[in-house]
Curated annotation (Swiss-Prot):
Entry's Gene Ontology molecular function annotations: metal ion binding; phospho-N-acetylmuramoyl-pentapeptide-transferase activity
Membrane topology classification: Multi-pass membrane protein
Cofactor(s) annotated in UniProt: Mg(2+)
Keyword terms of this UniProt record: Cell cycle, Cell division, Cell membrane, Cell shape, Cell wall biogenesis/degradation, Magnesium, Membrane, Metal-binding, Peptidoglycan synthesis, Transferase, Transmembrane, Transmembrane helix
Name of the featured protein: Phospho-N-acetylmuramoyl-pentapeptide-transferase
Length: 321
C-alpha cells in the first residue's frame, strides 16, 4: 500500500504543476523580488508562485486515501490538520503579496498569532487522541507551586512548530533549496518512523517525499514555479510535527540543520548590526552570503543539500538511539 500511495502522491503533483503554472501566469500571480536582494535574482521576477498548492493538494488527497485504509487514523488526522493549517496561513500570505504586487503579505504579528493558534490546537488534539504523554508537573523549589508539564510542553510545541515553519520559509530563497532539504528531512524521518515502529507517521513521510519529488522537477534551477509561503510554512510546520510525534525533537536540530543555520544567520546578522553597526555576513539568510561570495546558485544548493544529507544521517542515528 505504501508504494501505491507514493506513486499517487508523485503523479498528482507531477500532473498538477504544469496545469497550475499557466493558470498562475494568466492570473499574474508572479513572485516579486526584493530590490535589496542579489541582483542575479531580479530575472526571477514574475516566476509563478504559490506552487506549494500542488504538493499540498497531493498530500491531502493521498493522506485521505491512507486514512480510508488505515486501522489507526489519528496520526494522519493530526498531520493533515497541521498541513492544512500552516498551508492556509501561507496561502493567505501569498495571496496578499501577489495582489499587492510586493513582498509584504500578512504582518509578522498576524502570521505568528495564526501559527501559534495552529500549534495550540495541535496540542489539544494530540491530548484528545492520547498521543502526547507527559509527567504530572514540575515543582518549583522552595514554593508550593507546581507547573503542569503540559503547560511547559505546549510552549515548546508552539516554539518548535512556529520556529521551524519560519525556518523553512527563510531557506526558500534559491531554486530547489527548501524542496530538496525537505525531501531529505522527510526521508530521514520515514526511515526513523519505521525503525521505531510508527508506521502511520512513516507512511505520511513517504507521501511527503514523493509529493515533493514531483514538485522538485519544476522547482529546480531554473525554477518554473516557486512554492511560496503556501508551501514553505506548511513544510516547516509538518517537519516539526513529525519530530514531536516521534518523540525525537532533538533529532530535528541535525535533520533540519541547514534550516537552523539559515535562521541563526538572520538572527546573528540583525543582532550584530543593531549592537555594533557591522554585519557578520554579506547578506542573510546564509545562502545569499555564499552567492555574494561568488558561488553560483546551483553550487550553493548542491552544497547545502549535501550538508543536509550528512547532518540528516546524524539526526537519524540520534533519533533511533
Amino acid at each position: 500500500m505504501i508504494y501505491v500511495l507514493a506513486i499517487i502522491a508523485f503523479l498528482i503533483t507531477l500532473i498538477l504543476v504544469p496545469i497550475l503554472i499557466p493558470t498562475l501566469k494568466r492570473m499574474k500571480f508572479g513572485q516579486s523580488i526584493r530590490e535589496e536582494g542579489p541582483q542575479s535574482h531580479m530575472k526571477k521576477t514574475g516566476t509563478p508562485t504559490m506552487g506549494g498548492l500542488t504538493f499540498l493538494i497531493s498530500i491531502i488527497i493521498t493522506t485521505i486515501i491512507a486514512i480510508i485504509f488505515s486501522d489507526n487514523a489519528n496520526p494522519y488526522i493530526l498531520l493533515l490538520f497541521v498541513t492544512v493549517g500552516f498551508g492556509l496561513i501561507g496561502f493567505v500570505d501569498d495571496y496578499i503579496i501577489v495582489v499587492k504586487k510586493n513582498n509584504q503579505g500578512l504582518t509578522s504579528k498576524q502570521k505568528f498569532l495564526a501559527q501559534i493558534a495552529i500549534a495550540v490546537i495541535f496540542f489539544i488534539l494530540s491530548d484528545v487522541f492520547n498521543m502526547i504523554h507527559f509527567a504530572t508537573g514540575i515543582h518549583i523549589p522552595f514554593t508550593n507551586v507546581s507547573i503542569p508539564l503540559s503547560v511547559v510542553y505546549v510552549v515548546f510545541i508552539v516554539f518548535w512548530q512556529v520556529g521551524f515553519s519560519n525556518a523553512v520559509n527563510l531557506t526558500d530563497g534559491l531554486d530547489g533549496l527548501a524542496t530538496g532539504l525537505s525531501i531529505i528531512a522527510f526521508a530521514m524521518y520515514a526511515i526513523m518512523s519505521f525503525m521505531l515502529g510508527n508506521n502511520a507517521v512513516g507512511t505520511f513521510c513517504i507521501i511527503m517525499v514523493f509529493a515533493l519529488l514531483g514538485f522538485l522537477i519544476y522547482n529546480v534551477n531554473p525554477a518554473k514555479v516557486f512554492m511560496g509561503d503556501t508551501g514553505s510554512l506548511a513544510l516547516g510546520g509538518i517537519i516539526a510535527t513529525v519530530s514531536i510525534m516521534l518523540n525525537a525533537e532533538i533529532s530535528l536540530i541535525f535533520i533540519g540543520f541547514v534550516f537552523v543555520a539559515e535562521t541563526l544567520s538572520v538572527i546573528l546578522q540583525v543582532a550584530s548590526f543593531k549592537l555594533t553597526g557591522k554585519r557578520i555576513f554579506k547578506m542573510s539568510p546564509l545562502h545569499h552570503h555564499f552567492e555574494l561570495s561568488g558561488w553560483n546558485e546551483w553550487k550553493v544548493v548542491s552544497v547545502f543539500w549535501i550538508v543536509g544529507l550528512i547532518t540528516g544521517l546524524i539526526g537519524l542515528w540520534i533519533g533511533v538511539h
